[in-house]
Regions:
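Helical element adjacent to the flavin cofactor pocket in flavoenzyme catalytic cores
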Residues: 160, 185-239, 244-246
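Glycine-rich FAD pyrophosphate-binding loop
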Residues: 25-45
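N-terminal Rossmann-like FAD-binding beta1-loop-alpha1 element of flavoenzymes
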Residues: 5-32
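Rossmann-like flavin
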Residues: 91-209
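Glycine-rich phosphate/pyrophosphate-binding beta-alpha loops
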Residues: 47, 195, 299, 317-319, ...
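Active-site substrate-recognition segment that forms the wall
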Residues: 48-49, 54, 58-98, 251-369
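C-terminal lid/capping helical subdomain adjacent to the catalytic/cofactor pocket in oxidative enzymes
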Residues: 362-396
Length: 396
């Protein structure tokens, strides 16, 4: 038997780590290259939801109308930032509108639900096979609606995708008592029992440790540049490798670089959409809801992890490569906690990251310029990650 195939993965977030896991199981020699190490950007403090119930793509006429309405509201769920313009932003927005005009919502949502359901099954198997702990909480997800129009639309969505067996049903009973939330303003809700939450950063770190012990696997803290040009994945380390060097050294190269995939491969229409999160720990999280929440109108998610940690995340900001944590984007998350839970918490940590989004909301799993790509899953990267990693491993 010959030497195992050697594979370089660029990016050590959840896409890179899960891809490495499936490749390692097949006996490949896997080397991850990331300037910051494992899970230090979008896989550091996301909303935590493994949410089949949230697998709808955004390409609808109603979302375009909301986006226009929110243009002048700095604290709106979507901040378009009309003061920031670039060719990549124009191209992405045009692609989003184009995907909406082609009425791809139904077809693409079915695809993301399929990926999400497959990923759920694979995650359960990984947990059983590896025994890693990532503060997973099998609490389900409560999807709440606060106006009649959005609730009527949600009930139609339940019927529309019922055949997918995604497990999302109308929630019954006293929501405040059942889930420990303030429910006065809730018009209707759905519950998805099979959904869960987990700390993505802990998952990536612990799975990386597992692979170091069980696979031919290593992580290198390298910046990656294009043909000697200074186009880096953002990073703290000085050592740099070119994509050409990786292609010459390894049998295959896989780009799992999140939003930075479009820096390394400019032909791909992947845009960095900034999301924010706040995290409460210890006593600050004692009165958190019993289940994970998805507030449809506010576009905010909230997750109680199994280590007395409560994470609230959401909002989308189109501001190119700006990493600033803006107070006017954090405030809606804090206000949501005070308005919707029984928590009286004031101490929290903040985070923001650039999520890799394609215009049609579908991830890119393909070969581009002689390299494989696993990127573009955006806010569903954690939810669909296992299935996407399995798919690209099979394709290779």
């Amino acid at each position: 038997m010959g030497n195992p195939k050697s594979i370089a993965i660029v990016g050590a977030g959840v896409a890179g780590i899960t891809t490495a896991y499936f490749l390692g199981k097949k006996g490949y020699k896997v080397r991850l290259h990331d300037p910051n190490g494992v899970a230090e950007e979008c896989s550091y403090a996301n909303g935590g939801q493994l949410s089949v119930c949230n697998a709808e793509v955004w390409n609808t006429y109603s979302n375009i109308a909301k986006g226009i309405k929110w243009l002048t509201q700095p604290d709106a769920p979507l901040a378009f930032r009309p003061d920031v313009w670039s060719w990549s932003k124009i191209k992405w927005v045009a692609g989003f509108i184009g995907a909406t005009l082609t009425n791809s919502y139904d077809r693409n949502t079915r695809k993301t639900i399929e990926y999400s359901l497959r990923s759920r099954r694979l995650m359960k198997k990984l947990m059983k096979d590896t025994g890693i702990d990532f503060h997973h909480n099998d609490c389900g997800i409560l999807h709440i609606y606060k106006n009649q129009k959005s609730w009527d639309k949600a009930r139609k969505t339940l019927d529309r995708f019922k055949d997918t067996k995604w497990g999302r049903v109308e929630a019954k009973g006293n929501l405040a008592k059942k889930y420990n939330i303030y429910s006065k303003d809730i018009v209707g809700a759905t519950f998805t029992k099979g959904d869960s939450v987990g700390d993505i950063h802990t998952f990536c770190r612990h799975l990386s440790y597992y692979m170091e012990d069980n696979f031919d696997y290593k992580v290198y803290c390298n910046k990656i540049v294009i043909n000697k040009e200074v186009k880096y994945l953002s990073g703290k380390r000085d050592h740099a490798r070119t994509l050409q060097e990786l292609k010459e050294q390894y049998d295959e190269v896989i780009i799992c670089a999140g939003a930075y995939t479009s820096v390394l491969l400019p032909s791909l229409n992947i845009y960095p959409i900034k999301g924010y999160s706040i995290t409460f720990k210890g006593a600050e999280a004692e009165d958190a809801p019993f289940t994970s929440i998805l507030d449809d109108d506010a576009k905010i998610v909230a997750s109680p992890f199994n280590n007395l940690t409560f994470r609230v995340a959401g909002t989308a900001e189109l501001a190119d490569w700006n990493h600033d944590i803006r107070e006017d984007r954090i405030k809606p998350l804090v206000d949501w906690v005070h308005d919707n839970t029984f928590m009286d918490a004031e101490k929290y940590t903040r985070w923001a990251c650039l999520r890799p989004m394609t215009p049609n909301m579908l991830p890119i799993i393909s070969k581009v310029q002689g390299m494989w790509v696993n990127s573009g899953a955006g806010h569903l990267g954690w939810t669909m990650g296992m299935a996407l990693a399995e798919k690209i491993t099979k394709d290779i």
